[in-house]
A protein has these predicted regions:
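Positively charged, amphipathic and often flexible ligand-engagement surfaces
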Residues: 1-307
Length: 307
């Protein structure tokens, strides 16, 4: 299937934009804030929480980073005004990380403070491994500065993740644990499917044992079952953890989790730059392209649900 996945990715630039938009409709709320609002309302009506992500092009100057900050402030105002059950997820490159650490830190503080003023929460996404050190450094700095309404993401496929958990343990961190999708060399990330699964379970055990609040982010039903087992063994209340999934993916599994009484948060991306975002994400991991194509065509391809 790897050859098919890569072939699909190579074809994407030649695919008419309306077709790409149709393919991505289930996975992206739409171009405008109102689209995210309606998606979150539907999710809330189904008993699901949300996290909203503002999609943006690669930031090339401070004005573009400032525009992303303002967009998040608009999101917080909309969440509060409409009474939505949602927080936000931010990417540090969108806040100017590649332009300078201090600029990014100042922008993140602005977003986190605005969230705090409205009783909301900010999840700092993890990007490729070139940003891991600065992301974890910034998370620690904000937590030590007294900002408790901020969390971070750890990727189970990175070989360093369990060690990172030990470093963060004193913070009792709020962590989204996911597998990770960026293409990384084998000395940095596990590539074997079962090795990633095993490290996910190990990382989840470590996080729960240090008292972290964990968003168990996966569409892999085996890992969902392992997560349920681990929280049950520790007799955790449902308020002490949550599951997380992407918009439009494994909706059957999402319904079962909610029906069984687990809290579930859905990632809701929106923005006018949906096209560039879609192409970039698919190119970062060709397996996603194959997954979306198979899912859209209603075919069942073994191994796809193990993302």
């Amino acid at each position: 299937m790897a050859l098919l996945d890569r072939a699909i990715v190579r074809m994407l630039p030649a695919v008419p934009k309306p077709v790409v938009q149709q393919l991505s409709r289930r996975y992206i709320a739409g171009p405008e804030l109102k689209d995210a609002r309606e998606s979150v309302r539907r999710l809330n009506a189904q008993g699901k929480m949300a996290t909203i992500d503002v999609l943006g092009e690669e930031i090339t100057n401070e004005d573009e980073a400032a525009a992303i900050v303002r967009a998040y402030q608009d999101v917080f105002a909309d969440i509060e005004r409409c009474g939505l059950d949602s927080n936000v997820s931010v990417k540090l490159t969108g806040l100017g990380l590649n332009l300078g650490y201090d600029l990014c830190r100042a922008n993140l503080v602005t977003v986190v403070e605005d969230a705090a003023s409205r009783g909301n929460f900010v999840r700092v996404d993890m990007e490729d491994s070139s940003t891991t050190d600065e992301t974890l450094r910034l998370y620690r700095e904000l937590r030590e500065a007294g900002y408790d309404n901020v969390g971070v993401v750890l990727q189970a496929y990175l070989r360093r993740t369990v060690a990172d958990i030990h470093v963060l343990a004193d913070l009792k961190p709020n962590v989204r644990l996911c597998k990770g999708i960026y293409v990384e060399p084998p000395d940095i990330a596990f590539r074997d499917f079962e090795a990633v699964r095993a490290n996910f379970v190990k990382a989840l055990e470590e996080l729960l044992d240090v008292g972290a609040y964990v968003g168990i982010a996966t569409h892999d039903e085996w890992l969902v079952d392992e997560g349920r087992r681990l929280v049950s063994e520790r007799r955790l209340e449902t308020s002490e953890y949550e599951f997380q999934m992407l918009l439009g993916v494994r909706e059957d599994l999402a319904r079962r989790l909610v029906a069984d009484g687990h809290r579930l948060r859905i990632y809701v991306p929106f923005g006018r730059h949906w096209y560039a975002y879609s192409l970039r994400r698919l190119q970062e991991n060709p397996k996603i392209a194959g997954y979306i194509a198979a899912d859209t065509l209603g075919r069942v391809i073994p191994f796809r649900n193990g993302r």
